[in-house]
Amino acid sequence: MACLLRVALNPTFERSTVASQRQNPKTILSFHCKVSSFKTKTMSQSFAPREKLMRKCREKKEAEREAEREAEREAEEEEKAEEAEAEADKEEAEEESEEEEEEEEEEAEAEEEALGGDIEDLFSENETQKIRMGLLDWYDVNKRDLPWRNRRSESEKERRAYEVWVSEIMLQQTRVQTVMKYYKRWMQKWPTIYDLGQASLENLIVSRSRELSFLRGNEKKEVNEMWAGLGYYRRARFLLEGAKMVVAGTEGFPNQASSLMKVKGIGQYTAGAIASIAFNEAVPVVDGNVIRVLARLKAISANPKDRLTARNFWKLAAQLVDPSRPGDFNQSLMELGATLCTVSKPSCSSCPVSSQCRAFSLSEENRTISVTDYPTKVIKAKPRHDFCCVCVLEIHNLERNQSGGRFVLVKRPEQGLLAGLWEFPSVILNEEADSATRRNAINVYLKEAFRFHVELKKACTIVSREELGEFVHIFTHIRRKVYVELLVVQLTGGTEDLFKGQAKDTLTWKCVSSDVLSTLGLTSAVRKVPPFRLQHIKRLSLDVMVEKEQILECRCIQWLKHTSKAYLFLMSHQIEQPYRGNENSHDLLLTLFFMLLSFYSSCLALGIKFGDLGLKLNSLVSTEKSDGDV
């Protein structure tokens, strides 16, 4: 190989040496073996940078998958909150008549008699005192440091009440760790109820040009945007409406539970939390954690979702609440359920009231009984299966000289599941369908939803349309399979023809850039869709890059291979029959081979990617052509 390199690099190498080696068959065989060895070595070296690139891509893809899994976990919590919203809407819509209330009172009395007398007698005075003392002492030492537990002076009770209100609303159906960052961000923007009262639910500044559908990007991040990611957006709407109601009133912030329940969005639980924590009123609070603690304290195995059972839990909590420190006691009861008296793994050995816990006592007496048997677990109905096709509609408009396309979002109805949130155009299907059926359903929806006055193909030119993939989205009672397609269109005329029937005051759609998507109040299912498109683009870019590098590398190797074969053929042919052509041709061929060999080796040594090199060469040729030099 050293000899071969000297031929390529040393122009003074004697021609006689080449001629003598050309006449020796052993030299030909040795040369062939060395070329084969070099080809194998260079091919392995050439693929090393690409393998390194692919390894980095795989590592990056794994990190993206982990981030997606975390987003899915948060999305599941959000969907639970959204389902709770739907249930709350139904409960709110059902108004009880006087006759039903009387019947419930009679049933409640019968239930109390079945439990062994008045509900107030279930806890003895001694038990009540021990539970209060044990919980408060434990809470003073072990309470978590949460931003909404800051103490306020007497003159700042209203601000304290506002902080409790915001935190309790956010904590509904949402983990504490998730709420903390949202709470801090919320309080920085609206530190008092009067600041919140001046906000708007969604203040969209729409261009008054011909193209109402395209926003300028200066949308204000108001309540829904600040709430984005928490889910259950009905809570944000009620917070805003309640704040406006309080600010508009003349009596200030209500300081009693009965008055607080008259404020929009404040129910019995939230009213009890605000009144006891901020205004020191001796009223109970009952949530899922409190129900679990009370059910185990008294070994109540009844269904906690039953209305009569829920009423009994409220009476138990009212009996236990400490009149001197009602706020701290209510928080200690909730803290115990959240940290020690958990659903599946209670820490009874660390519990401050285990000696008063009936469920723990029964589990010690009988090993077949477990503390986790209380309260009774409600059997959930199996989720139904449905199917949804989503169209990521990307619109380009050359008239506005946009750097990129914008995505069409449709606003959901103000009532019902996911009320008022934004999503990509989508259609729910009754059964699983093939690609053609799904595409036809999307076409029909686009024409109807956007009130096209012309056919879709006449209003715009379809640049591309392809399926991006599918995923499964889990609701509490629905298992939805979502099919995603990307439709890229180029407007052929003014956008006033595309969305002519849409008025600004009834805005149900808008077009936003990809940067704005993350700031909007989107459903968790919608947030799963964009990664499909991003992965699709990355995959195409990577494939093109790798393909170009592979082609250039393979071509260079093929040139080396064919040149070496031609040279060996000429030399072997001259041994059998003296070559009568141009006696310099074989030397030129050998020189060409080593020029290519030297070029390829230099690129590998310098770490030059053949894809980048090809782009540079193409750019150079294009420049020369434009200058008239080629």
From Swiss-Prot:
Residues 54-123 are annotated as: Disordered. Residues 54-72 have a biased composition (Basic and acidic residues). Its cofactor is [4Fe-4S] cluster. It holds the Pfam family NUDIX_4. Disulfide bonds: none annotated. One of its GO terms (molecular function) is metal ion binding. Keywords: 4Fe-4S, DNA damage, DNA repair, Glycosidase, Hydrolase, Iron, Iron-sulfur, Metal-binding, Nucleus. It comes from the Eukaryota. GO terms for cellular component: nucleus. Residues 73-123 have a biased composition (Acidic residues). The active site is at 168 (proton donor/acceptor). It is an enzyme of class 3 (hydrolase). Residues 383-536 form the Nudix hydrolase domain. Binds 1 [4Fe-4S] cluster. The cluster does not appear to play a role in catalysis, but is probably involved in the proper positioning of the enzyme along the DNA strand. The record marks 287 as: Transition state stabilizer. SMART domains: ENDO3c. GO terms for biological process: base-excision repair. A motif (Nudix box) lies at residues 427-451. Belongs to the Nth/MutY family. This is Adenine DNA glycosylase. It comes from Arabidopsis thaliana. The lineage of its organism: Eukaryota, Viridiplantae, Streptophyta, Embryophyta, Tracheophyta.
